[in-house]
Amino acid sequence: MGFNIPRGTQDILPGESERWQYVEKIARETCHAYQYKEIRTPIFEHTELFSRGVGESTDIVQKEMYTFADKKGRSLTLRPEGTASAVRSFVENKLFANPVQPTKLYYIGPMFRYERPQTGRYRQFYQFGIEAIGSNDPAIDAEVIALAMSVYRKAGLSNLKLVINSLGDKESRTAHREALIRHFEPRIDEFCSDCQKRLRQNPLRILDCKKDRDHELLKTAPSILDYLNEESKAYFAKVQQYLTDIGIAFEVDPNLVRGLDYYNHTAFEIMSNAEGFGAITTLAGGGRYDGLTEEFGGPKAPGIGFAMSIERLLAALDAENVKVGADEGIDCYIVTLGDKAKDYSVSLLYKLREAGISAEIDYEQKKMKGQFKSADRLNAKYIAVLGEDELNQNQINVKDGKTGDQQAIGLDDFIRFLKTNTES
């Protein structure tokens, strides 16, 4: 009996994994330029971390988490997102005590949500995200957004749309919450069952409803922008000013909310309007969360971050027909003729690889013609032929895989020759 991977997961095979490495390399290099440092947190955490951090009323906590009891009955959950773990680590490891703030972190890794599998959406999916914790300067909001946009641009995307909103401070959100209840309570029976619960528990969440039947009702919703106090208005204006100064175009959408409860002030999404998608598709989202460290038992440390789906980034590259991460082939393939040459090539191959040269030999006892075919399939820059005659003469015949030019190289000079001619 064979085995298949679980529904909602995928194998990332050679040929495809190079594309992942390409975008992950861009993400890491961009983070280095912005001085964000990598953090690696456990794949599972105590369930309460997410129920308190993400929000009891969210779809993630209510419907989508992979939760299980360990052998001692403790409730654990596979992480559905990265912010809660990063903030927990910030508090637990007292990163707030570092003399230079904000603490700038990034992560790349798998997350888990029990969602309906569909194109570009998996139950195990990969996110790249950043968190800047310890500053409530609007400039850091602009920096976080700029970093996300930079990653997409460097990866090769051009059909991007940035949408921003302000969720205001606690006072502003309370006023807006009351306005939403007053406006929609008389029509509560017209909403889907989920939104009926949300209106009572967390009214802002109804604006994030994906049900078509509710969209017409939500068009009449009171705008959060009408309920921002002066401090929140000034903060949002400053964020917009910085984005304009940087040269990043954006749209303000007063109905934009994020699906997690911890957000306040700035919220944003980056979308692709590439024709290959057929519809505008959200690639990344994030925002400010100024109370999360205190929720986790730490000191007040305002934060902001984002998460982007690696799968959706790659899908966006496909939608724009951008080819990335192609296998560039190997530096050298050694064709061996006879047992002595094969025996010698094993140690020679080791020396080449230790010198940083990608090289391969035949392990299937193929004849010379078959070995040359393998070299072609591996897109070898150079094909070296080694037989008993070459060994007796202390040399190796080298063919340029592109031009076909051939020459005899002394075995003592072979590594130096390859390093000189394959270094980019």
UniProtKB/Swiss-Prot annotation:
Key word Iron present in the record? no
Which named protein is this?
Answer: Histidine--tRNA ligase
Would you identify the family this protein belongs to, as annotated? Answer: Belongs to the class-II aminoacyl-tRNA synthetase family.
Q: What subunit structure does UniProt give?
A: Homodimer.
Give EC number(s), comma-separated. 6.1.1.21
SUPFAM superfamilies, from UniProt?
Answer: Class II aaRS ABD-related, Class II aaRS and biotin synthetases
Keyword annotations from UniProtKB, A to Z:
Aminoacyl-tRNA synthetase, ATP-binding, Cytoplasm, Ligase, Nucleotide-binding, Protein biosynthesis
Instruction: Please name the top-level EC class of this enzyme.
Output: ligase
Entry's Gene Ontology BP terms: histidyl-tRNA aminoacylation
Q: Which Gene3D superfamilies match?
A: Anticodon-binding domain, Bira Bifunctional Protein, Domain 2
Q: Membrane spanning segments where?
A: none
Name the Gene Ontology molecular function terms of this record: ATP binding; catalytic activity, acting on a protein; histidine-tRNA ligase activity; transferase activity
State the compartments where it is located: Cytoplasm
Q: Among the entry's GO cellular component annotations, what is one?
A: cytoplasm
Catalytic reactions on record? tRNA(His) + L-histidine + ATP = L-histidyl-tRNA(His) + AMP + diphosphate + H(+)
